[in-house]
Each structure stands twice: as structure tokens, then as C-alpha cells.
């Protein structure tokens, strides 16, 4: 998990029986960061009121793309700023902040949708994606993208604006079907 101080979110992984360690975004691409299967950017990563995590992302674009290409899963939650372009991702993605509740509407079927498996609607969202060239796999009640997936090489990037704790099924699936990759 990329973050600069302890988060309640970390306890979720202990509850799921999964290993979780926290790292600074500035450590991406260095020899000090251990290999992992899933790399998570929690909600608020670009909001300076919460963290400095967003600072290291721009210069880490190549490391993140290499991680995904080799088989890693990058799970990205909302930046929690009014508007945000994910310029460090290897695809186009633009976020607009707008808190709302919704019953997510699946678009096709994708393993990433397991992120909300067994979570009763309505779900909280803190925005939507105004544009993307990734595959939209969930939309809100107004038809706006709230989860997008881009498969790159052997891995994938999952970006979502859903503001709920992720379901265990998503991590079980990603841990089972991926290998540890150096970031």
C-alpha cells in the first residue's frame, strides 16, 4: 500500500488473512521496495490534507507501468480533489469529485467487479470518471463510469471511485492468479 502513515484500511488485510505493508510513493522503483502482487493507492492519495503520497507518482510512471506489465495489479482509489488527471498511468483517466450513493451497474463481467462482491447497495462514491480509454466495468445510476480496468501485459490497473472497503473476493482472486513483481 502506498501511503505515508498508518491507516485503518490496513486492518482489513489482517482480517482477510493477507500480508500488507506500507511504503512511500517516493520509494517506487528503488531496490528497497519488496516485490508484491497488488499495489494499492487508497482514497485521498492526491489530497495534501491527508497525505503526501501523490507527490512521488509523477516520476514513478515507468516503474508502475513495468509492475503492471510484468503481472502486478495496481488498485487505485479516488484522489479526493475536485478534478484529477492520472497522468502517471499508462492510459487516459480523468476524475471529477462528486459525492453520491448508487447501485453500481455492471458493464459486462470482469474479475475487478469482485471488489464490491457481497456489499449491499447503495454504495458510496466520491466521484466518477469523466473520460478514459480503459474498459469501464461499473457505472453509477446515471451511467457514469465508477470503475475502469486496463489490462497491460500480464497485469492490470483497476481504478475506482467507490468509497467502500473492498471485498475479500477481489484480493483472493488477484493473489491467486498473479505472482509477486518488483515495483
Protein language model annotation of sequence segments:
Residues 1-88:
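Helical hinge/lid and interdomain linker segments adjacent to catalytic or ligand-binding clefts
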Residues 5-6, 109, 122, 174, ...:
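A structural signal for well-ordered alpha-helical scaffolds and beta->alpha junctions
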Residues 9-10, 144-146, 166-170:
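Short, surface-exposed beta-strand/loop "edge" segments at domain boundaries and coil↔beta transitions
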Residues 20-22, 74, 136-137, 157-159:
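Conserved beta-strand scaffold positions in the cores of enzyme catalytic domains, especially
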Residues 32-35, 50-51, 105-109, 169-170:
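Short, charged, surface-exposed secondary-structure boundary motifs
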Residues 38, 147-149, 159:
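Conserved hydrophobic/aromatic beta-strand scaffold that supports enzyme active sites
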Residues 73, 94-95, 155-156, 161-183:
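Extracellular ligand-binding/catalytic regions of CAZymes and related secreted enzymes
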Residues 77-155, 164:
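An acidic, glycine-rich "communication" segment
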Amino acid at each position: 500500500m502506498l501511503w505515508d502513515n498508518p491507516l485503518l484500511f490496513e486492518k482489513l488485510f489482517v482480517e482477510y488473512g493477507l500480508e500488507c505493508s506500507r511504503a512511500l510513493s517516493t520509494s517506487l522503483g528503488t531496490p528497497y521496495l519488496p516485490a508484491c502482487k497488488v499495489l494499492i493507492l487508497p482514497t485521498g492519495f492526491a489530497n495534501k490534507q491527508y497525505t503526501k503520497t501523490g507527490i512521488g507518482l509523477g516520476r514513478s510512471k515507468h516503474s508502475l507501468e513495468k509492475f503492471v506489465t510484468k503481472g502486478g495489479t495496481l488498485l487505485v482509489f479516488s484522489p479526493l480533489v475536485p478534478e484529477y488527471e492520472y497522468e502517471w498511468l499508462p492510459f487516459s483517466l480523468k476524475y471529477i469529485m462528486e459525492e453520491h450513493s448508487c447501485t453500481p451497474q455492471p458493464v459486462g463481467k470482469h474479475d475487478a467487479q469482485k471488489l464490491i462482491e457481497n456489499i449491499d447497495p447503495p454504495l458510496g462514491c466520491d466521484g466518477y470518471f469523466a473520460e478514459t480509454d480503459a474498459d469501464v466495468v461499473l457505472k453509477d445510476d446515471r451511467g457514469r463510469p465508477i470503475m475502469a480496468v486496463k489490462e497491460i501485459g500480464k497485469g492490470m490497473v483497476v481504478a475506482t471511485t467507490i468509497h467502500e472497503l473492498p471485498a475479500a473476493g477481489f484480493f483472493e482472486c488477484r493473489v491467486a492468479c498473479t505472482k509477486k513483481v518488483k515495483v
